[in-house]
């Protein structure tokens, strides 16, 4: 009597599911024996008790072999994968849970699946595929992957059972990254997760650079099923004054610095002296307008920066004159001025008098920070200032040209424009659902600028919510093709947005796309490191594959090597034969999911 060790080649060969079903060959003899024994018992050739005992034994062995054989066939049937399914909305509602997020159907990947994948890599899988009619044995004739579908089918057949995969809603506070190549299913995944957010009653903002009509229809369908009416829609190229909405990106602010930050978020690249001075310039103009009771908008900022600081400075100092000046203030101020030049206009001379009075006559404790910042620009080199404004004006031109003039800088007094005016605060308070079609295929630069402005606006409002302790409404932000619009505010949302009630999901195609936008792979990895959750679809780029798999860890893969040896010795005149067999089991530490298989999903 002997036993086969667990690690022997014979035991592994018999327990291996990816092989010919030898067990079925033994089923026929066992069942034939059962029939023959039943006949012998019926004819009283064998004692009834003995016949029944032997019949039970043969039937049991036949059933055992049949079960093992069908198990092998089922495992081989699963190698044909699973067909892409279109889920009905009613079925999606069955899986809905407001405390968790459903991400689809599948199985938990364990080391045993890595072992199966490693074993399959040694085989010619095409020889293991079952004919179409045999899939009917397992009710899979209409569920196997179709030939025209992309991906290796056996990757989805490594486990016989699938279940609903869920993650607790709280886990998504740290941000979600969806990565996958073109047509790999990013839009479907975004739609599935976004639909659940709409059903939960979140304030939902979806930024779609491409402007997929299919995605918008899914957006509308989810809102209809949730009873939330038709979603809001913003399109930067919309020339209609009746369709869509106008969105005021400068409506919510605490200081002029926030407005300056939003505008400068459109400028790519790292901070430098130019960006710092340009930011300070925009901030000064915004603060001056706020001090005068005017609401800054992209349009009015562009107009004032183009004209210069003189008009705003004149108005600000005149306010101080009305409040604090004595009757002879003009004579006092002119005493500090040199003789008037011939080419000096009345307007310039008047402003010089006001500046002289403010700087030399008005007591220092009555000076204000806003006027002081305006005076810095006033005394600054005109040549250098013109260079700064010449670089800033193209940015404002992108954000205020054509339809964007009314869309991003709405005028409430314009009776001809019937579109409603929304801002980030009103959108969140009403738990609105906003679809942003950036139309990047038509104009990528405008799309990137508008997307960056909206993200900057949301970041500023998230900071306000955090400061005021407002977390009553959950804000779900979804950004498709994030490499087109990512900026520092979006990075801040990924890093700290949950504190302000913003839960961000971004989708990208490859890591190099993000690196190209941000300027370096290091910057791209820093952004991706802020995403605590990852959903990986089919990835063709090797750098992206490595980024995904390095977070999965490693496991041990077992190999059994068999060595057979024979030896013939006839030097003594008589043949002498010797033989031997050895088995060597090794374990190698490998990636739990090899990187190259991400390109075969």
Language-model features and meaning:
Residues 1-206, 212-229, 291, 319-324, ...:
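Accessory regions of macromolecular translocation/handling assemblies
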Residues 2-7, 138, 147-149, 156-160, ...:
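P-loop NTPase motor domains
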Residues 18-21, 63, 269-287, 423-424, ...:
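P-loop NTPase motor core of the ASCE superfamily
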Residues 30-32, 437, 477, 531:
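Short, flexible active-site loops
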Residues 235-237, 508, 538:
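Residues at the C-termini of beta-strands that transition into short coil/loop
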Residues 242, 514-515:
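Short acidic/His/Gly/Ser-rich catalytic and metal-binding motifs that mark active-site loops
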Residues 509-513:
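Conserved H-loop
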């Amino acid at each position: 009597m002997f036993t086969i060790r667990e690690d022997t080649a014979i035991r592994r060969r018999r327990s291996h599911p990816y092989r010919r079903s030898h067990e079925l060959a033994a089923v026929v003899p066992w069942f034939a024996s059962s029939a023959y024994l039943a006949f012998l018992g019926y004819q009283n050739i064998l004692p009834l008790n003995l016949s029944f005992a032997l019949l039970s034994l043969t039937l049991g062995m036949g059933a055992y072999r049949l079960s093992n054989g069908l198990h092998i066939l089922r495992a081989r049937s699963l190698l044909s994968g699973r067909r892409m399914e279109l889920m009905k909305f009613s079925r999606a509602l069955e899986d809905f849970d407001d405390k968790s997020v459903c991400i689809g159907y599948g199985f938990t990947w364990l080391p045993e699946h890595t072992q199966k994948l490693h074993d399959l890599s040694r085989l010619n899988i095409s020889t293991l595929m079952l004919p179409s009619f045999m899939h009917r044995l397992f009710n899979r004739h209409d569920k196997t992957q179709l030939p025209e579908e992309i991906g290796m089918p056996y990757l989805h057949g490594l486990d016989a059972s699938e279940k609903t995969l869920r993650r607790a809603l709280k886990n998504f506070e740290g941000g979600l990254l969806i990565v996958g190549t073109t047509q790999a299913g990013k839009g479907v995944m975004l739609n599935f997760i976004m639909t659940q957010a709409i059903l939960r009653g979140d304030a939902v903002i979806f930024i779609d650079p491409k402007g997929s009509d299919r995605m918008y229809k899914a957006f509308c369908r989810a809102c209809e099923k949730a009873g939330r009416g038709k979603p809001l829609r913003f399109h930067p190229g919309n020339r209609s004054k009746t369709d869509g909405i106008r969105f005021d990106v400068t409506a919510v602010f605490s200081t002029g610095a926030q407005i300056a930050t939003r505008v400068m978020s459109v400028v790519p690249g790292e901070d430098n002296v130019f960006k710092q001075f340009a930011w300070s310039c925009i901030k000064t103009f915004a603060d001056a307008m706020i001090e005068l009771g005017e609401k800054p908008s992209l349009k009015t900022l562009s107009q004032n920066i183009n004209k210069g600081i003189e008009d705003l400075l004149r108005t600000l100092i005149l306010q101080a004159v009305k409040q604090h000046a004595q009757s002879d203030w003009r004579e006092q101020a002119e005493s500090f001025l040199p003789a008037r030049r011939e080419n000096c206009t009345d307007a310039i001379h008047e402003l010089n008098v006001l500046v002289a009075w403010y700087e030399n006559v008005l007591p220092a404790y009555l000076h204000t920070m806003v006027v002081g910042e305006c005076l810095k620009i006033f005394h600054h080199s005109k040549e250098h200032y013109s260079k700064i404004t010449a670089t800033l004006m193209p940015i404002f031109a992108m954000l205020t040209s054509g339809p964007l003039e009314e869309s991003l800088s709405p005028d409430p007094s314009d009776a001809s424009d019937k579109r409603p005016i929304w801002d980030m605060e009103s959108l969140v308070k009403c738990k609105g659902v906003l679809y942003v079609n950036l139309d990047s295929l038509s104009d990528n630069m405008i799309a990137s600028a508008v997307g960056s402005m909206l993200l900057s606006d949301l970041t500023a409002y998230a900071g306000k919510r955090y400061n005021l302790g407002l977390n009553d409404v959950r804000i779900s932000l979804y950004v498709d093709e994030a490499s087109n619009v990512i900026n520092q505010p979006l990075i801040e949302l990924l890093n700290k947005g949950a504190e302000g009630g913003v839960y961000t999901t971004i989708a990208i195609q490859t890591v190099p796309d993000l690196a190209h936008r941000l300027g370096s792979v290091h910057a791209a990895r820093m952004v991706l490191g802020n995403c605590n959750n990852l959903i990986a679809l089919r990835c063709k780029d090797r750098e992206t594959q490595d980024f995904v798999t390095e977070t999965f860890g490693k496991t041990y893969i077992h190999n059994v090597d068999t060595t057979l040896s024979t030896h013939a010795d006839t030097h003594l005149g008589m043949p002498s034969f010797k033989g031997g067999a050895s088995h060597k089991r090794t374990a190698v530490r490998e990636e739990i999911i090899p990187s190259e298989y991400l390109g075969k999903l």
